[in-house]
Curated annotation (Swiss-Prot):
Protein's name according to its UniProt entry: E3 ubiquitin-protein ligase HEL2
Residue span(s) of domain LIM zinc-binding: 222-292
Assembly behavior: Interacts with the E2 ubiquitin-conjugating enzyme UBC4. Interacts with histones H3 and H4.
Region (Disordered) residue spans: 1-55, 343-367, 550-631
GO BP terms, alphabetized: histone catabolic process; mRNA destabilization; negative regulation of gene expression; nonfunctional rRNA decay; nuclear-transcribed mRNA catabolic process, no-go decay; protein K63-linked ubiquitination; protein ubiquitination; rescue of stalled ribosome
Organismal lineage: Eukaryota, Fungi, Dikarya, Ascomycota, Saccharomycotina
């Protein structure tokens, strides 16, 4: 049989030997020695393979399929699966789960035994049963070894000093005080490990463990960048902490989800919003928080959709709330409808005309800084003028200057066209308490100015120059005749539109009675024997032109018309300037157009006209120049 084995074994050819000389022949000698040993042991090769396979099977049966430890005590489940007692007890004691580790079947009770080859279907005598974890123990030894896994024994103490410390905190204090050692409390809390499984470190070892980790793949416990010295078991716990305790920019998260940006609190996040994104500065959105957009286009769309009411009828410029200086206060968008006046009579008592922006109430320190910044801007950073400005404010605060005197001083100091002294008055008022007399005096000046601006913006007042004042009459300028129906109706209709008039009573109806209208006859139908006369009446400032042919007969009017006329007179309306008289200048020479039918025909009148023209030309040329050639008309075309 050995000869047959020798015949079957054929040496394999090494092709590297044909490529040239080899410098090192040691690998070749090793292969030759290996082949000799293999030839000698070929007879006993088959029995050795059988023995090794049996040993491997026994070793696999003695190892836990979960942790690969050698089985000392086993956990048998009703689903006929077997694990070590440590893995089975960890599932029930630390994870609080009763499912099988292999097939995930829920098992209310399992069995812990020292019979490694046993099966759940065999008969066992149970000596102890733990109701809390649902475990049946077949021996006291198994029960003791299993339940001792939960106890806090110190492995560094002597046998007679071993005791249960009851918690990780007391166990760590004992290690630190007695042995100058400690455990990682982060691992003890989150690792789901028994106390005896936790590694014991020195101070430096613990620091390296938490910051650097180890060579087995553990990279250390991550630390929160905002909470000093606070570390977490893994990135999952750190993410939960950052989500609950800190703020994340959702705009940056959308643009780059791989690297989200976190901030300590909302104040830091809002600073990031202001510098990196576009914030809606309307007060309602500032109160709601997180109203921020990626670009300016989205911000404008939000303002038009959510705050369109503050843009209707208002200036088209939007001033940011974040700056403490406003260059043009009249162009700031306000939340309230400052220019929608319900009636003229409500202006003195109303405060809706104030130029209040949407900035929330600021502190006195911010108001002083805003006042100083605006004053320096108006004074072009003149130190001397700013010292005067500060002295005026100090005199007013100490009572040496009244509010009116302060306003006059401001007007003399701030002479630039862009300087708004009333806005400075308003800023100075904000530095005083709201209920103080100094605040009320300054604010009264500011409110009065705002009402005037609002009135001018609503409807500009008419000119009240005495040189342009004229009474309104029917077909008569500058006279004292009774007003016509059209003028009366126009005056009554425009009462509410004039800012200087008093509002009529609600019960008065200018359209209650009808007014009889006298229609004017056409001028060409009036027959007169005498030429029309035009009367002129001169005054100091105006010229009254009243054509007599426009005078209509004075008819009796209704009582309501007289009443309305008296009311118009009592209103003292400003008189309108007189219109310039229309002058029609007639033409000097009336053109004579020839009949087209007579063109080309001889007529005596045409010949006589031609000869007359020639005679005139000869006469004029002969008078001017007695000698020389005379111009003659050779032919005449057209007219």
């Amino acid at each position: 049989m050995s000869e047959s084995v020798k015949e079957n074994v054929t040496p394999t050819r090494n092709f590297r030997r044909t490529q040239g000389p080899q410098n090192n022949t040691k690998p070749h000698n090793d292969r030759k020695n290996f082949r000799r040993k293999q030839k000698k042991n070929n007879l006993s090769a088959e029995p050795n393979l059988t023995t090794s396979s049996a040993d491997d099977t026994d070793e696999e049966n003695e190892l836990c399929v979960i942790c690969a430890r050698k089985l000392t005590y086993v956990s048998l489940t009703p689903c006929h699966h077997k694990t070590c007692h440590i893995c089975g007890f960890r599932q029930r004691a630390l994870y609080n789960k009763k499912s099988c580790l292999i097939c995930r079947t829920e098992n209310e009770e399992v069995m812990f035994t020292d019979r490694i080859d046993g099966d759940i279907s065999d008969k066992y005598n149970f000596c102890e049963k733990n109701e809390k974890y649902g475990i049946n123990f077949t021996s006291e030894e198994v029960a003791t070894e299993t339940l001792n896994l939960l106890k806090f024994f110190c492995p560094l103490s002597k046998d007679e000093q071993v005791c249960d410390f009851g918690s990780f905190k007391k166990y760590n204090e004992h290690l630190k005080s007695e042995h100058n050692r400690m455990i990682c409390l982060i691992c003890a809390t989150h690792k789901h490990a028994f106390p005896c499984e936790l590694e014991i470190f020195t101070q430096n070892q613990l620091r390296n463990h938490q910051t650097k980790g180890n060579s087995e793949g553990f990279k250390g416990h991550p630390m929160c960048a905002f909470c000093s010295g606070k570390r977490f078991y893994s990135d999952d716990e750190l993410y939960i902490h950052m989500r609950n305790q800190h703020e994340k920019c959702h705009i940056c998260d959308k643009m780059n989800p791989a690297s989200p940006q976190y901030f300590k609190d909302y104040n830091q996040l809002f600073d990031h919003f202001k510098h990196s994104h576009y914030v809606c500065t309307v007060q309602t959105c500032l109160d709601n928080k997180f109203v921020v957009f990626k670009d300016e286009l989205e911000l404008q769309a939000h303002i038009l959709q959510e705050h369109g009411n503050i843009l209707k009828g208002k200036p088209k410029f939007f001033q940011s709330e974040l700056s403490t200086f406003i260059s043009a206060p009249s162009r700031v968008i306000r939340e309230r409808d400052d220019y929608d006046l319900p009636s003229i009579s409500s202006l003195p008592g109303s405060s809706s005309g104030s130029r209040t922006d949407v900035r929330s109430a600021s502190s006195p320190e911010e108001s002083r800084l805003r006042l100083a910044e605006r004053a320096k801007y108006y004074l072009e950073n003149s130190k001397e003028d700013f010292n005067k400005f500060s002295s005026y404010n100090e005199d007013y605060s100490k009572g040496r200057l009244s509010a009116e005197k302060l306003l006059e001083s401001y007007k003399l100091l701030f002479t630039k066209p862009n300087a708004d002294v009333y806005l400075l008055i308003h800023n100075l008022a904000e530095t005083f308490p709201k209920n103080s007399s100094k605040y009320n005096n300054l604010n009264a000046i500011y409110e009065q100015r705002e009402q005037t601006l609002a009135r001018q913006t609503s409807l500009p007042s008419l000119s009240s120059d005495s040189s342009l004042s004229m009474s309104i009459g029917r077909g008569h300028w500058g006279g004292t005749n009774d007003g016509g129906s059209a003028g009366a109706a126009l005056g009554v209709r425009n009462i509410k539109n004039l800012p200087t008039l008093k509002s009529p009573s609600a019960s008065y109806d200018p359209f209650a009675t009808t007014v009889k209208k006298n229609t004017l006859r056409p001028v060409q139908n009036i027959k007169r024997t005498t030429p029309q006369s035009v009367s002129y009446r001169t005054s100091t400032n105006t010229v009254a032109f009243s054509p007599t042919y426009l005078e209509s007969k004075k008819g009796s009017s209704s009582t309501s018309l007289n009443n309305s006329k008296d009311k118009l007179k009592s209103l003292n309306l400003p008189q309108l300037p007189p219109p310039k008289p229309k002058v029609q200048i007639p033409g000097l020479n009336r053109p004579q157009i020839a009949d087209p039918k007579q063109w080309g025909k001889k007529s005596s009148t045409q010949d006589t006209n031609v000869h007359d023209n020639l005679r005139e030309l000869n006469t004029t040329s002969g008078g001017n120049k007695k000698k020389g050639k005379q111009k003659q008309l050779l032919f005449h075309i057209g007219v």
